[in-house]
Amino acid sequence: CIREWRGDTHFAILTSEDISRVQAGILHDAHLNYGGWIAQSRGADAEAITQAFADLESRGLAQDGVVSTAGLAVRELIEERTNELTQRAWQSFGLENTERFLNMVEPIGERLMKRIDDTAGPNWMPAARERRP
């Protein structure tokens, strides 16, 4: 429930910033250094990606088909706002409960990610992955 609430909050912030789903994929891709994969993996075709980049460029968030420093800053701001708005749920859950919960689910998550890597490849489930160098 907490995870879904965080996702819903994240989408609400994206909407409030007038960032489309394709633009969100492009910004997230740049943040994780995925090489242009995320927006396509979420169903955006070349035309939608081109239009999304044009919209980002008109706002100074991209230049020549590359997300700019300003675009990365907006992506980070959205993440920070999401964290700020959703931290209360974890605080009310408490540190001890959170640690017990993480100790229980992290091994399952690690096995799931290994299975995804083995079957679908290392690009799937970008939200569950660390930023690439």
Named regions from a protein language model:
Residues 88-131:
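Terminal interaction helix/tail motif
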Residues 78, 82, 86-90:
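Long amphipathic all-alpha helical oligomerization modules
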Residues 63-81:
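Accessory beta->alpha helical hairpin/"wing" motif in late/C-terminal subdomains of nucleic-acid enzymes
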Residues 20-21, 68, 94:
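Ser/Thr-centered flexible coil motifs
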Residues 48-62, 71:
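Basic amphipathic alpha-helical segments that dock to polyanions
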Residues 2-51:
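Short amphipathic alpha-helical interface segments
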